[in-house]
Amino acid sequence: MSPGPSGCGKTTTLRLIAGLEELQTGSVSWNDHVLADTHRSEPPEKRQVSLLFQDFALFPHLTVAQNVAFGLTDLSSAERDARVHEVLEQVGMLRYANRYPRYLSGGEQQRIALARARAPRPRIFLLDEPFSNLDTRLRNQLRDLSLHILKKSESSSLIVTHDAEEAMFMGDQVAVMKDGRIVQVGPPEELYFKPVNAFVASLFGEVNEIAGRVLDGHVHTPIGTICAPGFADGAEVDVLVRPEALRVVADEQNNAVASVITSRLLGRASLLHLSVPNGEVGGLHLHSRVSGKMLPSEGSTVGLTLDDQNVFVFAAENS
């Protein structure tokens, strides 16, 4: 799984693996077998790679079954029909086998595109932001379906996305990209709880940023003292606090105190906009996300505690 912002090189990486772009430097290998380098390139059709495009790219003049069968040229007619039946059944689209793509919804077309890409049993399965064109409900349904299909397959899969939550849901290993380079690789929980820099931390959700200075291995902030091991005294740092790390408590004694600016129910969670006194006009503006319904009135005062595993300290960007 490879998340990253637009323009970081995600799609180009997929196209290089698939053989749709020429390498200018380096090489592409699979199990020590070189697919491409600067001197030679294996043709795309020889690589046993399937690429699921963001825009589905179904053939409008072919039926669903004909679209799925398109890449199965090395099979007999009976084998081809059996494989088409199998993959359409996997994605729940068997009853649409004789329809044309124009009569299908976006979610249905995506299922057909998934079936077509899976049909040849590729050794490498590439997916280019496959769910980005779908509404939230359909996106969640198809992500779940795709995850189960990919887990059961014998292919190695690489999915690129700009959605960090999708990367955490779909990926066993996640490689974060920025400006054409991989910044950090690891399982989702490692990237979420142990990001190597502020970019990775902020990629996996909103963060509150607090500037500070290290003293005796700690940073003193308006919301509490944060451990900052490995930094020299006087070092300028940025403290990043996830909204869910700010826990709202009724007891203000021995806790940081915040004034409620506004509160909003987001369904399964509530988002609170808070102001914490910091000696400046307006105070320090922070966001807290709490589970369930918690809607303190505007102007009320609440106490704050911190969940340390969702608080990170990095060298200030301008230092």
What do the PLM-derived regions correspond to, one by one?
Residues 39, 46-51, 55:
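ABC ATPase nucleotide-binding domain
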Residues 18:
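Helix-to-loop junction immediately C-terminal to a conserved catalytic motif
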Residues 48-50, 58-199:
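ABC ATPase nucleotide-binding domains
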Residues 24-27, 179:
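Conserved coupling/switch loops of ABC nucleotide-binding domains, chiefly the family-specific signature
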Residues 26-37:
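Conserved ABC transporter NBD signature motif
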Residues 3-5:
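The feature captures the beta-strand-to-loop junction immediately N-terminal to the Walker
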Residues 11-14, 112:
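ABC ATPase nucleotide-binding domain helices that frame the ATP-binding cleft
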Residues 207-209, 216-319:
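Non-catalytic connector elements of ABC transporters
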